């Protein structure tokens, strides 16, 4: 199935409310491999409640279900994720209520 470029480029979401908790923050860290070595104290602050910190890359997936791409008509089993950009201006809070704005900036159909 061909990609409908105009449809995908017109998709966007504005001010979608989403919440995440400290539990989500720790689960993300565990999911990407932090905490495998119980003796590695550098990773402890990402998987344990005391002095908890958020991994910056969590911003790329934090509100995945709140986006607009469900209506894109794309078969995601056939998609290769080529690249993504992330600008970090300050550390993510360990838990928050956020507003999500998202849009597609480029599409390449190979």
Predicted regions located by residue number:
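Hydrophobic beta-sheet segments that form the core/acyl-binding groove
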Residues: 79-110
């Amino acid at each position: 199935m061909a990609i409908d470029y105009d449809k995908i480029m017109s998709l966007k979401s504005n001010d979608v409310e989403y919440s995440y908790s400290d539990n989500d923050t720790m689960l993300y860290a565990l999911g990407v491999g932090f905490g495998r070595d119980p003796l590695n104290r550098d990773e402890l602050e990402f998987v344990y409640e005391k002095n908890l910190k958020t991994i910056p890359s969590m911003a790329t997936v934090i509100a995945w279900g709140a986006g607009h791409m469900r209506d894109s008509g794309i078969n995601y089993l056939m998609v290769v994720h080529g690249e993504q950009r992330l600008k970090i201006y300050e550390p993510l809070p360990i838990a928050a209520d956020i507003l999500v704005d998202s849009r597609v900036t480029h599409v390449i159909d190979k």
